[in-house]
Amino acid sequence: MAHRGAHFAFRSRWQKTDDELCRHSMSFILHKAIRNDFFQSYLYLLEKIPLVKLYALTSQVINGEMQFYARAKLFYQEVPATEEGMMGNFIELSSPDIQASQKFLRKFVGGPGRAGTDCALDCGSGIGRVSKHVLLPVFNSVELVDMMESFLLEAQNYLQVKGDKVESYHCYSLQEFTPPFRRYDVIWIQWVSGHLTDKDLLAFLSRCRDGLKENGIIILKDNVAREGCILDLSDSSVTRDMDILRSLIRKSGLVVLGQEKQDGFPEQCIPVWMFALHSDRHS
């Protein structure tokens, strides 16, 4: 409560300052750019990072590429295409993560009124850790999408045993990827939503909604901040709190069917939550 009260005080001070800014001033221009990209999160980010620095880390465009995305690519170029690399060297968390994901998925697929088991899409797939252990045992075919070609090349070796069920590998950043219309029973998005701006996450979730078959669902699994929004400078990602995340989900035209906190992770870890989402057209 103390944090939220301090944030609202900060919000009021900033909005008053913003109202008084010259519409042609540098501060107004930078603020407008950040607010456009992080409309749900930007005031939390401005609490911790000065305006000019935040702009340089996120919304500034250099050589046609937004720095928030360019810096993430640089980070992942140094990540090895291994399970350890996919888990950020916390390989001991892979097993409880997989077990919880398998259990959560079973609640929403198979049977009347549930998602089918024909085709799934693994978003931000990396080498295919989730595909191998969670999706391929359930679905007739799986597709992978990731921005790193090196990860997708390794995925073909990593998934070799079940490779005949892998329909295709898409080398795209998620902000540039559009799932084919009504193709998937399940779209799995894990530990990658924080690499999208608020604007692009909202748009991507909307496109994923259109990519679902009848009764199809989206599984969103990610770190959820306890309060506000946190920018990780090391990998250029944001961790949003529950209110911010659910607001973006709602605005994308999706409804939360169920949510569950990941068990078995150390207390000092940022909480991880799983959400099952479907189109509000089915509500």
From Swiss-Prot:
UniProt GO BP: N-terminal protein amino acid methylation
EC number: 2.1.1.299
Keyword Thylakoid among record annotations: no
Localization, UniProt: Nucleus
SUPFAM superfamilies reported in the protein's UniProt record: S-adenosyl-L-methionine-dependent methyltransferases
Amino-acid positions noted as binding S-adenosyl-L-methionine in the UniProt annotation, renumbered to this chain: G124, R129, D146, L174, Q175, Q190, H195
Entry's Gene Ontology cellular component terms: cytoplasm; nucleus
CDD domains: AdoMet_MTases
Gene3D superfamilies: Vaccinia Virus protein VP39
Pfam families (alphabetical): Methyltransf_PK
Key words of the record: Methyltransferase, Nucleus, S-adenosyl-L-methionine, Transferase
GO MF assignments: N-terminal protein N-methyltransferase activity
Top-rank taxon, per record: Eukaryota
Catalytic activity line of the entry: N-terminal L-alanyl-L-prolyl-L-lysyl-[protein] + S-adenosyl-L-methionine = N-terminal N-methyl-L-alanyl-L-prolyl-L-lysyl-[protein] + S-adenosyl-L-homocysteine + H(+); N-terminal L-prolyl-L-prolyl-L-lysyl-[protein] + S-adenosyl-L-methionine = N-terminal N-methyl-L-prolyl-L-prolyl-L-lysyl-[protein] + S-adenosyl-L-homocysteine + H(+); N-terminal L-seryl-L-prolyl-L-lysyl-[protein] + S-adenosyl-L-methionine = N-terminal N-methyl-L-seryl-L-prolyl-L-lysyl-[protein] + S-adenosyl-L-homocysteine + H(+)
Protein name, as recorded: N-terminal Xaa-Pro-Lys N-methyltransferase 2
